[in-house]
Amino acid sequence: MNRITKVLVSILMLTLSVSSASAETNSINNVSSSEFDWNPVMEAIIQVESEGNPKAKSGNSVGVMQITPILVAECNNILKKKKSKKRYTLSDRYSISKSKEMFLLMQSVYNPLNSIEQAIRAWNGGNHFSVKKTQRYFEKVMNLLKK
């Protein structure tokens, strides 16, 4: 019985030390959304989506970032859950600054690790995007980011 206890304690200690090291690495590599600079990504997305035209329209998507009514509703649901009184309107999609605010709000909730790839693909294909279906869009945005 004593040997089993020693083995279990050893396994537990090993697990805790690996877990602790992993947490330290994550805290070093990950920057919170409020500190992460999404501006280059947003500007590249704007160029791909609308070439910077705030009056751009394509189906239900409008504005520089081609925001849909569903995304506006999701942003308002997030704000409601956060007990914020702020709400977005459908006309806010035509505002460059409010479009960027909605993008940042979505990243803060659905992309807490600030993955640029996830942000780009989710903007094109939704939160449950298909890598295959978003590949061309991802490459377009990344090519602009590399310039």
Residue ranges and their predicted role:
Residues 1-8:
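Bacterial N-terminal signal peptides that target proteins for export
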Residues 19-23:
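Sec/Tat signal peptide C-region and signal peptidase I cleavage site
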Residues 9-17:
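Bacterial N-terminal signal peptides
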Residues 24-147:
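Catalytic glycan-binding domains that act on GlcNAc-containing polysaccharides
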